[in-house]
Amino acid sequence: MKFVWVILILLSSLSLSGEGISIQKKDTAKVAFAKKDPNLFYDSLEVKASRNQVTRWIFNKLISTTKKEAINPELQSYEYYRTYEKKIIGSIVIKSLEIFGPDLYDTTKTATLWIEKTANKLHSKSSLYVIRKNLWIKEGQALDPNTIMDNERLLRSLPYIKDVRFIIVPRKLNEDVVDILILTQDVFSFGLSGGIGSINNGEIGIYDKNVLGIGHEIGTTLIANTNQSPHIGFESYYSINNVKGNFIDFSTGYSNTYLYHRLFVSFERDFLRPQSTNAGGLMAMRSFRSDKINQDDFVTSKSPLDYLFLDGWYGRKLNLGINPKDSRFQMTLSGRIRYISFYQRPLPDINNNQYFANSTMYLGSLSFSQRSYIRDYLVYSYGITEDIPKGYLHELVFGFDKNEFGNRLYSHLFLSTGNLFKNKPYYLYTSLGVGSYWKRTGLEQGIVDFKVNFISQLFNIWNVQARQFIKLNYTVGINRFEIEDLGLHNSEGIRGFGSSTEKGKKRLTLNIENVFFQNRSILNFQSALFSFLDIGIVGPANQSIFKQNYNAGLGIGLRIRSENLIFKTIQLRLAYYPNHPNDVNSIGFILDEVSKTKFYNFQPRGPEPLKFE
């Protein structure tokens, strides 16, 4: 779309100004210089566009510079809030900005395009009650910098909030009292989704992440398939964030499509901050027809599954005097009961192992967590504030599986840490999980999983801000069931690689991606070019991974996103697979929607077995 407008402006500037087109001998010096600074093209375009009113209006309205304005470093640091530590909070004022026009750095800006003005009028701003019920701070309390930072992060994590800033305003007549101004900016919460899987199937959906500004979510999707029944199905959901200010999230849904037929209801409360004393959740799901236990499960059944799934957990913070000087440290004890009963399922495998077994599982965990956050931007988002976690989460889990095919014990150790190095330019996350079920005959369904995630500093190349992302993952299955295999077509493998033949009990993957955030936006849509290289190897558990054949994918792509809208990121990707199996083409192109990647936040959780996926 951007290049269409560029071409229109160039053609219009030539025709409306009366200038002719002449062909001259190439100036190699100018070409080389332009390659070094691609923004010169837009600067030149702006000059051409300014020659008449029509093209000047198109350029100013549609193509704009999105370089970040100078950000007050005090607003970005913990030290800013620390200067007001223990001051009494006098008043809390909440100001909600329009979606289009102003931002947190200049609240006086206004929307200029008619479509932006219309969207501002149609949108229902988050009510003051919704914002206040998500506040941990109260008038009359002593100001705690950690609480302020955590509260900002909590509000930013809400699906209908774009960004938030807490501004401290000292009182001139009383130095011991401060007022707090909270600036919030919503996203346009109404959205559409859709996709075409092939000529025979597709879907279209509609949703609202902030119904009437009260923080409720509702959505429905029509899913069609001409070859499978029901030919036209639907799935709907309804959820409430933070029911009555208790920080309990409620969700319920029903679906009847060719993929599955089920209904569910859930309540969840997390350890949202280190000071959280308790957390837990309840979930009930009745699945009448499905090929998986969970939609993110890697194991699928060739025959329909019919089952009842119940799950409940509770966790509590332990105050045992361990590390009392660290306010970001949290030690938790949690327990879980998970029940599943099948009414229809496939037969056991040749070894009489049954992945889809009737089971009641009891789990307990002891977790040690330390977490804090650094603010940055242009990591996974496109200019809004992002909270980068640093710290660790270590957990020890024990369990007992009351299984119809034989009772067994379970245990795992999970270690993870993430930090920033060299005054915040680089981020490195590592994790190691080792676990297994235990029977009298030995261990089964064991796993060793090692991950490394690296994010580079934001650097400039050809006057464009860029980052590099590197992920390394090594997973080994130990005595896994025959039906359980690792593949290369999920988020840990090779993107766009749809092979069903490349699988095994052991996997090694390396993903390298370079992202180039563009300095220009069109109608508030930001974009980023990216290049990638994915390498994956799978094989049997009893053989060296380096003796197996490798698969790879490399290519380029474009991501387009507006942080003012609730829509997912639009992605165009072209890939080449040099060493591909027969069920994968050598060239792959895709246009799809992708969800925003999230950081691992070192938040204590309910105990559950390590996933082999």
PLM regions with names:
Residues 2, 16-443, 454-613:
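Immediate N-terminus of the mature polypeptide
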Residues 2-8:
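Sec-dependent signal peptide recognition
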Residues 8-17:
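Hydrophobic h-region of N-terminal signal peptides that target proteins for export
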